[in-house]
């Protein structure tokens, strides 16, 4: 299974802002497009880690079934 997410970059007076359309909270900025791209990769990882931590806290002690999902890089 492949899941494709969309990165959006916009030129602003300070450089670039970027976000992922399908992943709320994954947004960043950079002085250059390359910096914004790199920062967005880090932001994606941080959002996923934070969501995992929140989920683990919410289901702690609950009877749940966890199944892994593998997303292929585009």
Label every model-predicted segment.
Residues 1-6, 34, 38-74:
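Short, charged, surface-exposed hinge/linker loops at domain edges
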Residues 8-21:
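Short aromatic-glycine-(Arg/Gly/Cys) micro-motifs in beta-strand/loop hairpins
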Residues 24-33:
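A short, exposed loop/beta-hairpin motif centered on an aromatic-Gly-Thr core
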């Amino acid at each position: 299974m492949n899941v494709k997410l969309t990165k959006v970059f916009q030129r602003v007076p300070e450089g670039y802002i970027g976000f992922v359309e399908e992943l709320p909270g994954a947004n960043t900025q950079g002085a250059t497009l390359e910096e914004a791209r790199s920062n967005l990769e880090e932001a994606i990882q941080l959002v996923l880690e934070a969501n995992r931590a929140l989920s683990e806290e919410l289901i702690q002690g609950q009877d749940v079934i966890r199944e892994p999902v593998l997303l292929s890089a585009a």
